[in-house]
A protein has these predicted regions:
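Short, small/acidic-rich helices and loops at N termini and domain boundaries
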Residues: 1-35
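The Walker A/P-loop phosphate-binding site
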Residues: 29-127, 132, 355
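Short gly/ser/thr-rich secondary-structure transition/capping motifs
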Residues: 47-54, 148, 208-211
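Amphipathic alpha-helical transducer elements in NTP-driven molecular machines
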Residues: 53, 115, 119, 148-152, ...
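CheY-like receiver
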Residues: 59, 153-157, 191, 295
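Phosphate-binding/switch region of NTP-binding enzymes
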Residues: 67-68, 73, 78, 165, ...
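Conserved inter-motif catalytic segment of the P-loop NTP-binding fold
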Residues: 101-183
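C-terminal regions of RecA-like/P-loop NTPase motor modules
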Residues: 159-160, 236-355
C-alpha cells in the first residue's frame, strides 16, 4: 500500500522511529480537518424545497458560484461593487434588479485595486442612490496569494463576521495566474465552495472574441452556475459609459434578456436603465434574437434578407432564429415566400397578421 511504501522510505532514512504509529496519527489529524463533503442527505426528507433564490436578481444566484466576465477596462469591478452595495444594503443600484429582504455583509477579496479605490467607489454608488454609509456592510481584504492557500483563514473570517456573499476580483489572480491549469482552477472552485456562501468571481474575457466563457480552461465555464458578460462602449472625453450585460449561462433557470445601462460619472455614480443598447458596437455582441428584435422595432414588416443585411448576419442565421421563435417573439405575413416579419407584440395593431 502507499502507507507501507512511505514507512519503508522513512525507515531507510531514520530507522526504528515508530513510523507506522506516527503516520497513523498524521492520517487521523488530516481526517479531522480536511473537508470531504457535507453529511449524507435523503432528498425525500426535504419538504417544499424553495425556488431558485438570488442575492441580487438576476445577476447573482444565492448560494451558487456566479461569474461576471468582460474585457479589461469595462467597469466590471465597479459592477461588482454595485452588487455588494445592493446585497449588503438591500437597495437597488442597477435598474431592473431586485435584492433580498435580509441583507448580510459582503467580503470583497481584491487582487487588483486598493482599499481607497474601493471605498471611493462604494461611497459614490451610495451617493448615487441617496443612501448613507453604514459600518460593517462591506468588508475588504487585499489579496496577494491564491485563494486556496488562504481558504481556511478566509473561512474563519467569513463565519465570524456573518458574511453572506464573497466577491473575488479577479479570478486570474486568485489562481496565481494559472487560468489555463485545471490543477489550479478546480481547487479554486472547491475552496470557495467550502465556505458555504454566495460567490461572485470577476473574470477576464479571452483575446479571441469567439471563445465561450472566461479566459483559460473550460472549467471556468463548466463550474459557473450563472454566467454573465459585460460589454462596454464609451466616447473618449465623455463622463458616461454605455453598457449591456448578456446572460450566457444559467444552470437553474432560463436565460435572462440582456440588460442595458448608461453609467454616469460625477461626484456620484449612477446606473440609468435603457430599453435597448444605443451603441451599434454593443448591439453586435448581443444574442441574435436581441439584434433581430431591435431591428424589427425600427423596421417592422421586413423580410429575412432585409433583416440579415440590417444586422450584418447571414440569411440562414436570421431565418433559423426567426423560425425558432415564430409565434413567440415574431409573426410573419401570409405569403408563402418572402414573408415579412414583425414583433409579436405588434400583432394587435396589425389586422392582417397570420401566425
Amino acid at each position: 500500500s502507499n502507507t507501507d511504501g512511505h514507512i519503508r522510505s522513512l525507515n531507510r532514512r531514520m530507522k526504528d522511529r515508530g513510523w507506522d504509529a506516527r503516520l497513523t496519527l498524521v492520517e487521523q489529524s488530516l481526517n479531522s480537518v480536511v473537508e470531504i463533503g457535507d453529511d449524507l442527505v435523503d432528498l425525500s426528507t426535504i419538504e417544499n424545497p424553495p425556488p431558485v433564490q438570488y442575492a441580487v436578481w438576476p445577476f447573482v444566484e444565492y448560494g451558487e458560484h456566479n461569474i461576471i466576465a468582460a474585457d479589461g477596462g469595462t467597469t466590471k469591478s465597479l459592477m461588482a461593487m454595485a452588487m455588494a452595495v445592493s446585497y449588503s444594503y438591500g437597495k437597488i443600484v442597477m435598474p431592473g434588479t431586485s435584492v433580498p429582504l435580509d441583507p448580510k455583509p459582503t467580503l470583497y477579496l481584491d487582487y487588483e485595486s486598493s482599499s481607497a479605490t474601493q471605498a471611493r467607489r462604494r461611497r459614490q454608488l451610495l451617493a448615487g442612490i441617496g443612501i448613507a454609509e453604514e459600518a460593517g456592510k462591506i468588508l475588504y481584504k487585499r489579496m496577494y496569494s491564491p485563494v486556496q492557500d488562504a481558504a481556511t483563514e478566509l473561512y474563519d473570517l467569513i463565519a465570524s463576521r456573518g458574511v453572506g456573499m464573497v466577491i473575488i476580483d479577479s479570478g486570474a489572480r486568485a489562481v496565481g495566474g494559472e487560468t489555463s491549469s485545471e490543477e489550479m482552477v478546480i481547487p479554486y472552485f472547491n475552496a470557495v465552495a467550502s465556505w458555504g456562501v454566495t460567490i461572485l468571481t470577476i473574470a477576464h474575457k479571452p483575446k479571441d472574441s469567439t471563445s465561450r466563457g472566461p479566459a483559460g480552461v473550460a472549467q471556468w465555464w463548466n463550474q459557473a452556475r450563472n454566467y454573465w458578460e459585460l460589454v462596454k462602449d464609451q466616447t473618449p472625453g465623455q463622463n458616461e459609459v454605455h453598457l449591456s450585460v448578456r446572460h450566457d449561462k444559467a444552470n437553474d433557470e432560463s436565460l435572462h434578456v440582456p440588460l442595458s445601462y448608461r453609467l454616469a460619472f460625477g461626484e456620484d455614480i449612477r446606473y440609468h436603465g435603457l430599453d435597448t443598447p444605443v451603441s451599434t458596437n454593443i448591439m453586435s455582441q448581443m444574442p441574435i434574437s436581441t439584434q433581430i428584435t431591435n431591428f424589427l422595432l425600427n423596421s417592422p414588416q421586413s423580410t429575412v434578407k432585409e433583416i440579415a443585411i440590417g444586422i450584418e448576419r447571414s440569411d440562414k442565421v436570421v431565418d433559423n432564429e426567426i423560425r425558432k421563435n415564430e409565434g413567440k417573439l415574431y409573426y410573419g405575413s401570409k405569403e408563402a415566400y418572402n414573408r415579412r416579419w414583425s414583433l409579436i407584440e405588434d400583432k394587435k395593431e396589425d389586422p392582417w397578421a397570420i401566425l
